[in-house]
Amino acid sequence: MNTLGHFLRLTTFGESHGSVIGGVLDGMPSGIKIDYELLENEMKRRQGGRNAFTTPRKEDDKVEITSGVFEDFSTGTPIGFLIHNQRARSKDYDNIKNLFRPSHADFTYFHKYGIRDFRGGGRSSARESAIRVAAGAFAKMLLKEIGIVCESGIVKIGGIEAKNYDFNHALKSEIFALDKEQEEVQKTAIRNAIKNHDSIGGVALIRARSLKRNQKLPIGLGQGLYAKLDARIAEAMMGFNGVKAVEIGKGIESSLLKGSEYNDLMNQKGFLSNRSGGILGGMSNGEEIIVKIHFKPTPSIFQSQQTIDIKGNECECLLKGRHDPCIAIRGSVVCESLLSLVLADMVLLNLTSKIEYLKTIYNEN
C-alpha cells in the first residue's frame, strides 16, 4: 500500500529517477497557518550533498503545493504537493539493470511484479522519503497548535554510542549527533567506512515532548487494542528503508529487567521515571515519547559482491552511483517526520474518544 494513517492520511507516489515524486495529505484541518520557512528547513535537513557524510546527490527539494492551501492557510481539503527530481543519473545503473544488488529490494520487487525500475531502486528508493518529510512538516504545523514538538538525533554510529543527549547540538551537527563529545569519533567511523568502500549502521533517537518544558503531553493518544500508539509508531518506522528494529522507552533492555527494576512508579506529581517511553496500554501517558530506530548499514557499497542475475546465473556486482555511507543520519529526520504524522493522526482520532469532545464542537452552533 502507498498510504500511511487513518484520520490524517498520506499517500505518496513517484520513483527515484522519475520526473517527480509527490504526495496527497488528506484530513488536515482547515485554518492552519502554513509555515513555509519550517517546510523549507525540514527539507534542507534531509537534503543530500550537504557534507561528506551523506549522499553526493543534492536535489533542490523545493516543495510545490498544488492544492489544499489558500492565502497561506489550509483549507481542509487534500493538500497535494510535488517535488521535481532534477539530478538523477540513470546511467550509473546501466551495469546492474539485469542483476540483483545484494540486500536491496531488487530481488523481491522483480519476483513480485515481474518488472522493476532498476534506476536508483525505483519506488523502493529512499528518495521517496522526501515526500514523508514534507508531509511531516505539515503535521508539525498541526501539532504546534496544540503544543507538541518532535525532535531527533543520532545515538549510535556503528558501536560508538552517545553518552549524553543534546537535541540542540544535534540540530547544528553535520551528522545530527546528540553527544558533542562522541561526535568526532562517530565521524571517524563513517570516514573509515567510506575509505574502505563500505558503509555503517546506526541508531537514531526520536522523541515527542510538550512545546512548553514544564507541561506534559496529552494523555490518551492511541487506542487500547487495534490502534495502539506504539504499534502505529513501529509500523510507520518499519515502513521506512533500512529500519530493522524499533524500541519504545527501554525497549530491548526491558527483557533483561525485573518488574521491580522496570516499573515506572508514581506519586501525586506524576511518574518518577519513564522506562515505558511515554506509552502505557497503547496510549500516551503524558510523559515524553521516546523511540529508538535501528538502521542497517547502507546496502549500496563500492565493493565487488557475489550475486545472481535475473536468469539465476551467478555473477559479480560492482556498484556505481551516489549513496549514503550511513542511512541513519538522514533517516533520523525522516523518522522524526513519521512520528509527527502518527501523532497528528492520533490527535484527530482522539476527538472521537469522549462525547464531551463532540458536544464541545457541535453545541457551539
From Swiss-Prot:
Its EC number is 4.2.3.5. It comes from Helicobacter acinonychis (strain Sheeba). Disulfide bonds: none annotated. Transmembrane segments: none annotated. NADP(+) binds at residue 46. FMN binds at residues 123-125, 241-242, 281, 296-300, 322. Keywords: Amino-acid biosynthesis, Aromatic amino acid biosynthesis, FAD, Flavoprotein, FMN, Lyase, NADP. Pfam families: Chorismate_synt (PF01264). GO terms for biological process: amino acid biosynthetic process; aromatic amino acid family biosynthetic process; chorismate biosynthetic process. Homotetramer. InterPro entries: Chorismate_synth, Chorismate_synth_AroC_sf, Chorismate_synthase_CS. This is Chorismate synthase. NCBIfam families: aroC (TIGR00033), PRK05382.1 (NF003793). This reaction introduces a second double bond into the aromatic ring system. GO terms for molecular function: chorismate synthase activity; FMN binding. Its cofactor is FMNH2. Belongs to the chorismate synthase family. The keyword Lyase applies. Gene3D superfamilies: Chorismate synthase AroC (3.60.150.10). The lineage of its organism: Bacteria, Pseudomonadati, Campylobacterota, Epsilonproteobacteria, Campylobacterales. Reduced FMN (FMNH(2)).
